[in-house]
Amino acid sequence: MDAPERLMPREKMLKSGIGSLTDVELLALFLRTGVPGKDVMALAHETLQRSGSLYGLLSADFAQFRGTGIGIAKYAQLKGIAELARRYYKARMMKENALLSPEMTREFLQSQLTGEEREIFLVIFLDARHRVIKHSRLFSGTLNHVEVHPREIIREAIKLNASAVILAHNHPSGCAEPSKADKLITERVVKCCQFMDIRVLDHLVIGRGEYVSFAERGWI
């Protein structure tokens, strides 16, 4: 069932720009129509409430959509949007050959690690001017653990002639707070890199709609 025109966010977007839309309005714009007994704004609001956030929505599996009125076609489109965002940030980083700000770094890492069901440890390798040489998913693990080998990071950095690295991994559980093991492995990597005159600029832990930066907390 279509929402009345006054409820559609399309006019608001055309008048004030896409950035003026709330998360609910943006989702309603994507959904276009509601379902019997529920207009599109109500459907969008309920769907976001169930998933907790846009992050939760885009990383959810299809089982979580059952009973919402969103079918397999819309689910596939949502997953496509998430993948487009991931590839956009990757293409942007590779084109500009740089991460120009902490915010851009965070957004890129969130786009790469959001929705992963296992812990992934990713490393960004940078040259002496902090331009991106390459980023690699060096290690993958289980739901709550990933085995990290500092020597593999060093080997790749030397091969690429990197002067600095940024570390990142995700917590599929959603909580970005670093564990004791996260802190210990970061210390090990930092010490190994210092020995080879390679700087560790940061280690970001990506959770569900949140993150923790070791550099921002003064741990690096």
Curated annotation (Swiss-Prot):
- Keywords, in A-Z order: Hydrolase, Metal-binding, Metalloprotease, Protease, Zinc
Kindly give the Gene3D superfamilies that the UniProt entry links to this protein.
Cytidine Deaminase, domain 2
Top-level taxon in the UniProt lineage: Bacteria
Q: Which InterPro entries does the record cross-reference, listed alphabetically?
A: MPN, RadC_JAB, UPF0758, UPF0758_CS, UPF0758_N, UPF0758_YicR
Any one of the GO BP annotations: proteolysis
Metal-binding as a keyword of this entry, yes or no, is: yes
Which residue numbers delimit the MPN domain? 98-220
* Keyword Cell inner membrane on entry: no
Which residues are listed for Zn(2+) binding in this entry? 169, 171, 182
Similarity comment: family membership: Belongs to the UPF0758 family. YicR subfamily.
Q: What is this protein called?
A: UPF0758 protein CKO_05095
Query: Which organism's genome codes for this protein?
Result: Citrobacter koseri (strain ATCC BAA-895 / CDC 4225-83 / SGSC4696)
Classification from the root reads: Bacteria, Pseudomonadati, Pseudomonadota, Gammaproteobacteria, Enterobacterales
